[in-house]
Amino acid sequence: MSKLSKNGLSKISNKTVIFKFKNETIAIAVNEWMENPEKAEAKYGHISKWDTSQVTTMNRLFFKATLFNEPIDEWDMSNVTDMSYMFSNATTFNQSIGNWDVSKVTTMKYLFSNATTFNQPIEEWDVSNVRNMESMFSASVFNQLLNSWDVSNVLNMDRMFAFSN
């Protein structure tokens, strides 16, 4: 059985450490990962296995992360409400994230803006609660089907695909 400490670390065995991220700690950990992946992995575990179930905002998390291309498809996005600028200017990222539960997200503005490599299927995303998709794919190479998306609650789609290929 694991015990959760005040800092979010949970020790399951002598070798396994799981960090339960919150809004404040996820941004710090991502910055540490960008600076030194090995050191961050020793501290938090591999980024692909991070417990993001308590995170509600991913705003600017990988903004301008030009070398980031790690698999993060196992992240629990079920409580996230804000994905603004998450991969904006992340020019190398092109990982599968189509299985994410984004059903609580209300803003996706500039999510993939200037993400010049990302072109993965995300048609299965439940975007029915999204209100803002402004410039979501602007200046990107994204070319996937989105015809199953329910965008009936979106209030702002300004420049959603501006300058896209």
Please report, for each region that a protein language model flagged, where it lies by residue:
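Negatively charged
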Residues: 2-165
